[in-house]
Amino acid sequence: MATKKSGGSSGNGRDSRGRRLGVKKFGSEKVIPGNIIIRQRGTKYHPGKNVGMGKDHTIFSKISGFVHFRKGVFNKTFVDVLEISSVS
């Protein structure tokens, strides 16, 4: 008979996978309608011209063009998509 009780398995050793958040299309990259530009929690980046925001704060393109980041009032960062014809 064993004189020492068997050790139980550890209760730790699990972790959830990352949420794959962040910038997916960077400044001056070409996008088409529906392309995801940024996945985020909350509004670190705000939607600007020609972009939309999903209910999970994902920013996506509404038109074909190029991604542009700019600072607005109160140092907020806005994401725009500039039309191909307006970029020279």
UniProtKB/Swiss-Prot annotation:
Family to which the UniProt record says this protein belongs: Belongs to the bacterial ribosomal protein bL27 family.
Alphabetical GO biological process terms: translation
Name assigned to this protein: Large ribosomal subunit protein bL27
GO molecular function: structural constituent of ribosome
Pfam families hit by this protein: Ribosomal_L27 (PF01016)
Record keywords: Ribonucleoprotein, Ribosomal protein
GO cellular component terms attached to this protein's record: ribonucleoprotein complex; ribosome
